[in-house]
Amino acid sequence: MAIKGPRKHLKRLAAPANWQLPRKVKTFTVRPSPGPHSMDKSLPLLLVVRDVLKYADNAREAKKIIQTGKILIDGLKRKEYKHPAGLMDVLSIPEMDETYLVLFDESGRISLKKTDKTDVKLCKIVNKTVVKGGNIQLNLHDGRNQIVKVSDAAKAEEDVYKTGDSVLISIPEQSIAGHVAFGEGKLAYITGGKHVGEFAKIVEVENRALYSDIVTLENKDGEKFKTVKPYVFIVGQDEPVISM
């Protein structure tokens, strides 16, 4: 019998391996709502409040906390307990003067890192297109689209944003506040593969026509390794442009 419509439930045993979630306590857990992040790169807000931050003992308490609107993601109130909090999202609780950044730990699990209060967020450009009117649309890793107004998209001096670059998005205005280009010598955060969760500098980029580019990086211990470009998230030059 065919499945009609999107799935509404998720068994704990079928949840992504990088969720910090006890598997055999109960049968089901929260399925994140469709949104800015894929399921394997995000956590539903309920799990963030109950299982990661430990602000609640059960789902009922966590829902009540979320519904107060006191938890912000990227400067916006989120009252839906299924809303996904994903990579590089800035989660803040102004009433408690706490700010967290959603990252991966070195085991690849989704985690929260307590950070300084920030008014910007890092986003990776995953694609870009020219839209009606000749302007450039940047498609970012968290599902948002940013329009860059230009007089002529074919001019290199106006088309400064490239796929793989990172941009700083202001909070809560949600507009572009800065730009960090992809390239050799830049500091990157690894979002997948064996070296997930590590910071490393780009040493070399091998361009390939039919497959993802191969990037050679060097970590703080001087170890060199290779990974594919989709796993490389540019965060700065010598230091991250935000507190990480």
Curated annotation (Swiss-Prot):
<dbReference type="Pfam" id="PF08071">
    <property type="entry name" value="RS4NT"/>
</dbReference>
<feature type="domain" description="S4 RNA-binding">
    <location>
        <begin position="43"/>
        <end position="106"/>
    </location>
</feature>
<comment type="similarity">
    <text>Belongs to the eukaryotic ribosomal protein eS4 family.</text>
</comment>
<dbReference type="GO" id="GO:0019843">
    <property type="term" value="F:rRNA binding"/>
</dbReference>
<dbReference type="InterPro" id="IPR013843">
    <property type="entry name" value="Ribosomal_eS4_N"/>
</dbReference>
<keyword id="KW-0689">Ribosomal protein</keyword>
<keyword id="KW-0687">Ribonucleoprotein</keyword>
<dbReference type="InterPro" id="IPR014722">
    <property type="entry name" value="Rib_uL2_dom2"/>
</dbReference>
<dbReference type="GO" id="GO:0003735">
    <property type="term" value="F:structural constituent of ribosome"/>
</dbReference>
<dbReference type="Pfam" id="PF00900">
    <property type="entry name" value="Ribosomal_S4e"/>
</dbReference>
<dbReference type="InterPro" id="IPR018199">
    <property type="entry name" value="Ribosomal_eS4_N_CS"/>
</dbReference>
<dbReference type="GO" id="GO:0006412">
    <property type="term" value="P:translation"/>
</dbReference>
<dbReference type="InterPro" id="IPR000876">
    <property type="entry name" value="Ribosomal_eS4"/>
</dbReference>
<protein>
    <recommendedName>
        <fullName>Small ribosomal subunit protein eS4</fullName>
    </recommendedName>
</protein>
<keyword id="KW-0699">rRNA-binding</keyword>
<dbReference type="GO" id="GO:0022627">
    <property type="term" value="C:cytosolic small ribosomal subunit"/>
</dbReference>
<dbReference type="InterPro" id="IPR013845">
    <property type="entry name" value="Ribosomal_eS4_central_region"/>
</dbReference>
<dbReference type="InterPro" id="IPR038237">
    <property type="entry name" value="Ribosomal_eS4_central_sf"/>
</dbReference>
<keyword id="KW-0694">RNA-binding</keyword>
<dbReference type="InterPro" id="IPR041982">
    <property type="entry name" value="Ribosomal_eS4_KOW"/>
</dbReference>
<dbReference type="InterPro" id="IPR036986">
    <property type="entry name" value="S4_RNA-bd_sf"/>
</dbReference>
